[in-house]
From Swiss-Prot:
Superkingdom in the source lineage: Eukaryota
SUPFAM superfamilies: NAD(P)-binding Rossmann-fold domains
Family statement drawn from the similarity comment of this UniProt entry: Belongs to the NAD(P)-dependent epimerase/dehydratase family. Dihydroflavonol-4-reductase subfamily.
Name of protein: NAD-dependent epimerase/dehydratase FUM13
One of the protein's GO biological processes: fumonisin biosynthetic process
This protein's pathway: Mycotoxin biosynthesis
Enzyme class, spelled out: oxidoreductase
Organism, scientific name: Gibberella moniliformis (strain M3125 / FGSC 7600) (Maize ear and stalk rot fungus)
Annotated keywords: Oxidoreductase
Gene null: resulting phenotype: Leads to a strong reduction by at least 90% of the production of fumonisins B1, B2, B3 and B4, and accumulates 3-keto homologs of fumonisins B3 and B4.
InterPro entries for this protein: Epimerase_deHydtase (IPR001509), NAD(P)-bd_dom_sf (IPR036291), NAD(P)_dehydrat-like (IPR050425)
Gene3D superfamilies: NAD(P)-binding Rossmann-like Domain
Function summary: NAD-dependent epimerase/dehydratase; part of the gene cluster that mediates the biosynthesis of fumonisins B1 (FB1), B2 (FB2), B3 (FB3), and B4 (FB4), which are carcinogenic mycotoxins. Within the pathway, FUM13 stereospecifically reduces the intermediate 3-keto intermediate 2-amino-3-oxo-12,16-dimethylicosane to the 3-hydroxyl product 2-amino-3-hydroxy-12,16-dimethylicosane. The biosynthesis starts with the FUM1-catalyzed carbon chain assembly from one molecule of acetyl-CoA, eight molecules of malonyl-CoA, and two molecules of methionine (in S-adenosyl form).
Length: 369
């Protein structure tokens, strides 16, 4: 089957990572069917420059299908027709006023993942399911200390038991970690038991888990600087933009460029040459480069004009910082799949900072017109 005949079902296409995956998937020549909770978001995707360029360069199909609730028993049962690959990027985030983090975040992540796997099990055309996991799913998050005993790297095969409710009580960020951990464990359990619900069909696909660290870099659908820093970028370019205290936040200073994350997802779709199909198996890939927060300010001062950072009131003039620690990860397999070393911190900060600058320049220009 030629790539132009292959169809990728993509979740999370409006997010930081998901949109980047969408663009690179189209650029690689795949047709895409994107799930949306709100179909009005399709216009923003279709009108974006990178998507328009990708569609005009090749004869491809980009379609959208509404999946309002990932936890519904047959949420994906009707959307996988003729799909050859599934890329599940969407992450459960706290929505509305719900204070039940288990229901709002963890159950959505776990049940959504199970539903996708079960639907794929019932769709013979699916050959591969690629899932966006996280390094937070495989390291112990309590207590927060260095995860790297002398001489040992955390590997993609490491796992962590599900967290109990006391760990994430009242903390949506910890609930996100618990959700990623539980979803990864649910994926492993599915493959181990071929838990496909009522079907007795043998498995006919494999699973690829992509495990990024903090994802820095431009956001394709961002409209304002606050959109850019809403998410993991707050710990990247957001460090020199946030004027509020960090209140003792301590985090793992390991990051990756959104372009690398997206490209690894797309390369993982190649089940012929780059990553041959292994039915019933899972293969996992970690992305991350170590950094020190003080390096972010140094990059900004080196790469951007003085007026953007010289005073504390400047766009990139914030002086605060957070506490940090390092974890050693085995990233060799991901770099081999990518085909090159990961982009460094400087590229991550420069690219996201440049997006902020262009936005602000555009706002200034419009205000004078």
């Amino acid at each position: 089957m030629s790539r132009g005949q292959e169809l990728v079902l993509l979740t999370g296409a409006t997010g930081h990572v998901g949109y980047a995956v969408l663009v690179k998937t189209l650029q690689a020549g795949y047709n895409v069917r994107a799930t949306l909770r709100d179909m009005s978001r399709a216009d923003a995707i279709l009108s974006s420059g990178p998507v328009q360029e990708a569609l005009s360069a090749q004869d491809l199909d980009l379609s959208f299908v509404r999946v309002p609730n990932f936890t519904a028993p047959d949420a994906f049962g009707l959307v996988l027709s003729n799909v050859t690959h599934v890329v599940h990027v969407a992450s459960a985030l706290r929505r509305g006023t719900s204070t039940d983090l288990k229901e709002a975040i963890i159950d959505v992540a776990v049940q959504g993942t199970r539903n996708i796997l079960r639907a794929a099990h019932n769709c013979p055309s699916v050959r591969r399911v690629v899932i966006t996991s996280s390094v937070s799913a495989i390291v112990d998050q309590h207590p927060v200390v260095s995860q790297s005993p002398a001489g040992r790297c955390v590997t993609p095969l490491d796992r962590h038991a599900d967290y109990d409710a006391e760990y994430y009580k009242g903390d949506s960020l910890k609930a996100y970690t618990a959700a990623k951990t539980a979803a990864l464990n649910a994926t492993d359990a599915f493959l181990a038991t071929a838990d496909g619900g009522p079907t007795t069909l043998p498995l006919h696909f494999d699973v690829i888990n992509i495990m990024p660290s903090f994802v820095f870099g431009p956001k394709g659908l961002a409209a304002t600087p606050s959109d850019v820093t809403n998410g993991s970028n707050i710990f990247g370019i957001g460090l020199v933009m946030r004027h509020k205290p960090w209140d003792g936040i301590r985090l793992e200073a390991v990051c990756c460029h959104v372009d690398d994350v997206a490209q690894v997802h797309v390369n993982a779709l190649n089940d012929h040459e780059l990553l041959p199909l292994k039915v019933g198996a899972h293969r996992d890939f970690i992305l991350g480069v170590k950094f020190k927060p003080e390096e972010i300010g140094e990059i900004v001062r080196r790469r951007f004009p003085r007026e953007w950072w010289e005073s504390e009131s400047a766009t990139f003039g914030a002086r605060g910082t957070y506490d940090w620690y390092h974890t050693d990860y085995d990233v060799g397999s991901a770099e081999r799949l990518l085909g090159r070393p990961f982009k460094c911190l400087e590229e991550q900060i420069y690219d996201s900072g440049s997006q902020v600058m262009e936005m602000l320049k555009g706002m200034t220009t419009r205000s004078y017109n």
